[in-house]
Amino acid sequence: MGQFTVVSLGLLAVFLSLSGAKGDNCPANWISRNGVCNKLFPDRKTWLEAEMYCRALKPGCHLASLHRDSDSTVLAWYISDHFKGAGHVWIGLRDTNRKRTWKWSDRTSTNYFSWNQGEPNNVQDNENCVHLWAPSGYLKWNDEPCASLHPFICQYKL
């Protein structure tokens, strides 16, 4: 029995050291989800200013892209739990050609949407950027003019 415990502990130590070697840890104040690191910045910026800020942080960093319900849930929890009263929060989705063709700033596939009911509605033909809608608990999206000022979430792949 004692030898089994020693071998088990040895295998556990090897597993933990190898899993740490993958580099799946995000820097302090960033959260990890599905192979990416995210951080909310409370500074209020336009969509383009926020995207440029993210890009300046490190190569490959952009406004956050969401590709499944679990992505939305993790970010909604993070914002709600750590940034009370943040208001709407920019994500990396926008309609660059103003034809209701939504694309992520990191150029990943646009295969998932979580629009709030009645959205996107393109009020005054001027809503071409997307934020997480605060009244939905950050689970739903709304289109908004890109010049609006909001906090934002940056993201980069591990």
Curated annotation (Swiss-Prot):
It is found in: Secreted. Mannose-binding lectin which recognizes specific carbohydrate structures and agglutinates a variety of animal cells by binding to cell-surface glycoproteins and glycolipids. May be a calcium-dependent lectin. Belongs to the true venom lectin family. This is C-type lectin lectoxin-Enh5. One of its GO terms (molecular function) is carbohydrate binding. Residues 1-23 form the signal peptide. The lineage of its organism: Eukaryota, Metazoa, Chordata, Craniata, Vertebrata. Residues 33-155 form the C-type lectin domain. The keyword RNA-binding does not apply. PANTHER family: MANNOSE, PHOSPHOLIPASE, LECTIN RECEPTOR RELATED. A motif (Mannose-binding) lies at residues 119-121. GO terms for cellular component: extracellular region. Disulfide bonds join C26-C37, C54-C154, C129-C146. Expressed by the venom gland. Keywords: Calcium, Disulfide bond, Hemagglutinin, Lectin, Metal-binding, Secreted, Signal, Toxin. Ca(2+) binds at E127, N142, D143. It comes from Pseudoferania polylepis.
